[in-house]
Amino acid sequence: MRVIVCTLIAAAVLVSGPIARGQGKARTLVAVWAHADDEGPVAPVLARYAREGVQVHMIIVTDGAQGAANTSVARGPEIARLRVEEARCAARALGVQPSILLGFPDGALGHYNADPALLYRVTQRVHEEIQRLRPDAVITWGPDGGYGHADHRMVSSIVTQLARAGAPGVPPQVFYSFLPAEGIRAMYPTRGVPPFVVPRAELLTVQVPFTDADLNAGRRSFECHKTQVSQEAIDRVIPAMRDTWNGQAPLSPMVPEAPAKDLFR
């Protein structure tokens, strides 16, 4: 993906009770992405949950072989290899579990609708991993895919389909990440904001507090994705995250609910 790092957005983490006190079974949060750098908008949230004792996993659906936004390396196997290392680096920076890499072709997921067999295969693989992890909550892209990216939109659709169908091991607690207009401008200062990609404010009912330490962990994770984002862009994005959210990152729940600050209600 062409870096979806920007004004981070996030999920909530008031992991009080058993997790914070180390009692009982730790809760599990799974983030499902198309590409290795898609965690950017919720990186501080993932860092905070991990810091508070939640088992945080990232499922990366594609091999990332077509993403060469910030490198002279040709698209293909070498980029894919580099992005595996970048995914590992980002997971370490956030303090989450090692990334789960499914290896589907980058840039191709949007075409899977035309082939029911391929669509079933990728849906089955995503379901297998979520079912194995049995999360209490899931984060993924919203239906807009952040800025309309077809791979992002397909991953969002798959996760939503599984949750709505009550697939075994998939909770209804699904939360959508998005790219705020300020983040898109910080990331791509020469481009405009695509139409119809930023959700209405009233849909962002989950406001997740994060600390400066969590934001710094997010910065370190962004810096891992050297083939995707420049240091100059990161230096614009991190202040945009901090200033836009003022310590609370918004997410949109799949199932509309009253305002909340916890993904595990």
State what each model feature region is.
Residues 5-15:
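Bacterial N-terminal signal peptides
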Residues 14, 66, 183-184:
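Flexible loop/turn segments at secondary-structure boundaries
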